[in-house]
C-alpha cells in the first residue's frame, strides 16, 4: 500500500479540521452486510486533506440529507468495485457488469443533489464521478470496450 503524505506543517488554515463525508458501500461478509469505505479514501481525507473522515452509511431515506450536509464541510464521492445500476441511466442490467450496490445508489444520488443545491463542496473519484454524472441526468457506457 502506498503511503499518502500528510500536509506540511502550517499549510492547513487554523481552526477545527474539516469534516469530510465518505459514502459507504454495502458488502456481504458471509451472511452479514457491512458498510465499508476504502482505506485509501479515509487516509487521503485524514492525511492529504488534514480532515476528519466521516462515513456516510448507505441507509437511503433513513438519512436526513440536509441535516447531514449542514454538519459536513465537504464530500468525497469515492470509487468502489460496484457499478451504478444501469436502470438509473436508461440501460439494461447485465451480470457481466455486476456487482451493483442499489443501497449506495439510493443514498448517493440524493446526497449529490442536496450537496449541489446546498453548495457543499464535492469531489468525485471513479464510481463517485459516475454517480455525479447520473445524478445530473447523464448516461454511462457500461463497458468502454463495447
Feature roles, as predicted:
Residues 1-123, 133-141, 145-146:
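N-terminal beta1-alpha1 cap of cysteine-dependent amidohydrolase-like domains
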